[in-house]
Amino acid sequence: QPYTFVAYSDPYATYIANVLDRFSNGEDFTYTLMDLNGDGVQELITKEPDGQEMTIFTIRNGERKDYARGVSYVCEGNILEECEIWDDTGRRYYGFYRCGAEEAEFIEKVVRDPYTLYWGHAFAGQDGKTIREDQAWEIINSYKHIDLTMKSFTEYPLR
């Protein structure tokens, strides 16, 4: 029986039921719940099958809303990390975001230029500057990843 013909009171349940109906591998999508911004509402953190990036949703005014996309890691202190590495060029991007009330708010980034292989660093609202590789890794490693316990969408309590 299709999941989406049921009227769910939980906006996350409606989304998950839709995925389970639409995708033949819906059971391979995973989720966890965590209050990332301290507002008392659990954010829905999702990952597609074989996906490296997470999509995060929240509930505002009784509706599911996008909170953040392209998230690689959740870090201690309710920080989100976006990490992009291009092995063929040497380019790297590490962006760090604080979990704000409405959305993820940019804090700082560390990048590696694929042509010069120099490292750069910039805070929100400031111009970037060149830094040494050891400084780059010190900044990147200062954000500690949290191990998330992800569950199959089929385990979500549809209500």
Feature names for model-found ranges:
Residues 37-47, 78-84:
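Acidic/hydrophobic-patterned starts of short beta strands in beta-sheet-rich repeat architectures
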Residues 41, 54, 93-94:
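Extracellular structured ligand-interaction cores
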